[in-house]
């Protein structure tokens, strides 16, 4: 658990399955005492011993509404907990907090992730639109999930996912950018989330392209053999 003394009672207002493995949940509660920035995470207690953090797609303190997209991969207690959620369920929401946040001073933003990153990417996209900033989103997804971004109004390039070569298609896509585009986007803020190995490889590529380390914000959501990073 990473948030101490920041617990707010919430109730599940409604749920919707965009796909058998992609569930949207809207939570409602008094969030007026909280402060949210795009990119921050919230946390739920999912069992007596387990906590899981998620990045909201929408968080509105004034209206008391929080929306989360859950990737139901079926591999752990977090997935099972999210699948069981239904209207009327009550729980405590912890946060928001975490080290990732929208870099307001920048006008160019690039988000990378996978199925576990949809909420983060949508939240950052909507923030960028509101600011009039330029935004690009790259997602490595299983082929059967390539339609997911469109289903949730996320403008993203869906790329193939490889177990053996993490982020390979995303790296090839970035390396194919013409020099003129790199000159324009080299000072961008890069938000890297999802699989730890993919983040490591993308980060290495960006550094080799001359992107400064302070422009790269990372948040690994999962890694092989580890439960709930």
Annotate each PLM feature.
Residues 1-229:
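Extended, composition-driven regions rather than compact fold-specific motifs
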């Amino acid at each position: 658990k990473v948030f101490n003394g920041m617990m707010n009672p919430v109730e599940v207002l409604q749920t919707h399955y965009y796909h058998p493995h992609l569930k949207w949940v809207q939570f409602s509660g008094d969030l007026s005492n909280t402060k949210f920035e795009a990119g921050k995470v919230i946390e739920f207690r999912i069992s007596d011993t387990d906590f899981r953090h998620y990045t909201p797609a929408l968080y509105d303190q004034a209206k008391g509404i929080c929306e989360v997209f859950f990737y139901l991969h079926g591999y752990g207690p977090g997935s099972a907990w999210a699948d069981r959620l239904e209207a009327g369920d009550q729980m405590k929401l912890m946060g928001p907090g975490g080290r990732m946040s929208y870099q307001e001073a920048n006008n160019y933003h690039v988000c990378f992730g996978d199925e576990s990153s949809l909420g983060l990417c949508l939240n950052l996209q909507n923030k960028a639109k509101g600011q009039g900033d330029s935004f690009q989103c790259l997602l490595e997804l299983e082929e059967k999930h390539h339609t997911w971004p469109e289903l949730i109004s996320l403008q993203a390039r869906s790329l193939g996912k490889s177990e053996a070569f993490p982020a390979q298609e995303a790296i090839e896509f970035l390396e194919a950018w013409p020099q003129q585009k790199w000159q324009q986007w080299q000072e961008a803020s890069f938000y890297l989330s999802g699989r730890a190995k993919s983040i490591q490889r993308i980060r290495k590529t960006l550094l080799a392209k001359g992107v400064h380390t302070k422009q790269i914000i990372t948040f690994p959501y999962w890694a092989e053999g580890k439960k709930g990073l």
